[in-house]
Amino acid sequence: MSAKTVQGRNGKKPASPAVNLIAGGGAGMMEALVCHPLDTIKVRMQLSRRARAPGVKPRGFVATGVEIVKKETAMGLYKGLGAVLGGIIPKMAIRFTSYESYKQMLADKETGAVTSKATFLAGLAAGVTEAVAVVNPMEVVKIRLQAQHHSLADPLDTPKYRSAPHALFTVIKEEGFSTLYRGVSLTALRQGTNQAANFTAYTELKAFLQRVQPEYSNTQLPSYQTTFIGLISGAVGPFSNAPIDTIKTRLQKTRAEPGQSAVSRIMVIAKDMFKQEGARAFYKGITPRVMRVAPGQAVTFTVYEFLKGKLENSGWAFVGGNYEE
């Protein structure tokens, strides 16, 4: 069960799509429940206008979190969770299934070996695939919900978007279906670079641990080791594409002006950010984003490997072999 081959243990085929669906969906759901509050803080920091006021220090991630809880209760940290949970199962199913498919296409036809370049390209393609299929529409709805500053403790403080389904319906009704794909190019670029870095780092670290621990060369690593390398691999992506994520968030939060193209909107947003807030604005929310993504990947890989192993050992008809990271 080497990390750098598509061949499963004892010559079996890789895990079936059903295994990826169940294990990936379960892992993604756990990731969302554990890490969503940090994502809400990240979005609020990226949308904050405090940095535009002269002499006003931008609020940090801890202060932002405290402010949300104080004004909106702790449940305010989970705004948009419904949209995330609604898309997490297909997102993870598409991520792992498409990554495995692309990896098989790029593997050596005779030996099944997968190079680091092939791993990077497979991760890149998987990230773009999930962005177009699931992530962008989900994030448009999520960001609209997270951007609302109403208090969940006050029943008279009625928000525009009451839930994820209501937000989805309202956005489509008022702004059109195409709004769900606003910023899709940036989302695809972000997800592609994220998964390219994520899968490459995870695979290389897993291969290294298997080399120095021969007893795990053809089996799963201990869960604590999977968690550790998942944490490291998850921290790589955010630093490489933070400006993309910040611009994307602002693009998806606001309405489009009539006749304005996506490219021109991106340029206007980037120009205004730099002019009014400086270069640091492009890295707004980087701390909570790393704190959100890195633990999220640690949870995802750990839970995924655990569930996948259980499913494969259960003897279900779903099993097609061992999925390789």
Swiss-Prot record:
Subcellular location: Mitochondrion inner membrane
First-listed, main subcellular location of the protein, grouped into a coarse class: mitochondrion
Segments crossing the lipid bilayer: 21-41, 82-102, 121-141, 187-207, 221-241, 282-303
Keywords, ordered alphabetically: Membrane, Mitochondrion, Mitochondrion inner membrane, Repeat, Translocase, Transmembrane, Transmembrane helix, Transport
UniProt keyword Repeat, yes or no: yes
EC number, as in UniProt: 7.-.-.-
Membrane topology field: Multi-pass membrane protein
GO MF assignments: succinate:fumarate antiporter activity
Residue ranges of Solcar repeats: 15-105, 117-208, 221-310
Gene Ontology cellular component list: mitochondrial inner membrane
Disruption phenotype: Leads to fluffy and albino colonies, and reduced conidia formation, when all 6 genes ctpA to ctpF are deleted.
Keyword Transmembrane helix on entry: yes
Role, per record: Mitochondrial transporter that does not mediate citrate export from mitochondria to cytoplasm. Its exact function has still to be determined.
Family: Belongs to the mitochondrial carrier (TC 2.A.29) family.
Protein name: Mitochondrial citrate transporter C
Organism the protein comes from: Aspergillus niger (strain ATCC 1015 / CBS 113.46 / FGSC A1144 / LSHB Ac4 / NCTC 3858a / NRRL 328 / USDA 3528.7)
Name of the coding gene: ctpC
